[in-house]
Amino acid sequence: MRSLTGMPRLVALVALSAFAGPSAWADTLADKLTPHVGETIDLVELGTGRRFVRPVLAGVVEKNDAVTGLRLRAEGQKTVTTVSLSGIAKIVADRETVHEAETTGRAFAQLRGRRGREAYDRQAEASAARMKANGVEPWPQLTAEEHAAEVTSLKAFVTEIRQKFPGLAVSETHEFLVASDVPPAQLAPFVANLDSMHDFLCELYGMPTGEPLWKGKCLVIAFLNEADYVAFEEGVLKSGMQGTQGVCHQRSDGRVIMVCHRGADPAAFAHMLVHETCHGFNHRWMTPQRLPNWLNEGIAEWVGTRVVKNCEQVPLKEARAAAFMRSKGTLGPGFFTAANIEPMQYGMASGMVRMLISRDARKFAEFVRGIKEGTPVEESLQRSFGGSLDDLVKAYGAAVGVPNLSTTDE
């Protein structure tokens, strides 16, 4: 679902009685919303199923001491739109659902929106049943208080590391907490790519935008200089990352910390930010189940090309990978099984992901979802696309001009 950026005011004034009108809960709703006036809230979903994602709550409209509507400024917009409370299905602020209406109306648009939500709920129930059958536990559903506590903990961690790296300045988006010594004017467009990546993956996987995904927020620590990046990794997180530009730390408790340095190429920096945080998103989506490395890297590379339009890294990697495959006739060692694929294989991984998504994005989401539910990779591929890994290699080989492409090194 997309946010309502640029939606005409007339469309936003949903006055049809799809939901129960203002009543006793409207009084308490005012108490819950008033502290957020002037701030960005998570979500306002209309009865039609359309959504304001990360809007600014410009004001609360009241009549006879009851809430009758909201004044919202859609993300990235300057104008304020008034939305009737009778047409609102759900309001989420500070990770807390502060309003969820009971459906009563019969108008076609509202029924369509309700059916969409019911279909998503049925999918979630079926997914939960498959997880249970596979012995897989989903990530815990956190309360608003638990999300807030995690953000507080992350900020305390940043305060601690600023004692060693005092140049780090702290900023926030709705989904990300950012600590960086990169000049703010230089950093801003790159940080904007992070929220774009978040929304893009929500749409790819069929996850409603505006719903909580991270544990609190994803922490991004971006250094200007490589030496500080290496010193932080070795001295604070006790990991050796010499020779890399960024890394995504994905903890078993759900916390995600992405650390990087700017480097000399702005487009490469932008792509790397998206690539690494994409790994964090995949870690947090649904369950802790790990994706195979070729798929995880392929998704991260492909998403980077969609979010960072001016980055030529991935097409160049795919071209080099194609030349390698034409020369060797193989994907190289352990492509489907390696814990970490070889640098040459990144272009193969992104090429396979791009091919699968271009064939059917919905089936691709089902394929990834199946793995996160605990289904073995090849079984999930068979269920979604009707083929095996060997079939995938044959199709990909044909696409890159290597009809006899092999997975072996022979």
Name these PLM-found stretches.
Residues 1-7:
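N-terminal secretory signal peptides that target proteins for export/translocation
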Residues 5, 22-23:
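Intrinsically disordered, low-complexity terminal regions
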Residues 52, 81, 177-178, 389:
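Short, isolated positions in well-ordered beta-strands
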Residues 25-166:
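Compositionally biased alpha-helical segments
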Residues 9-21:
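Bacterial N-terminal signal peptides
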Residues 239-256, 268, 272, 287-410:
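Acidic/His/Gly-enriched intrinsically disordered linker/tail segments
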Residues 165-291, 376-384:
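Juxtacatalytic substrate-recognition/specificity segment
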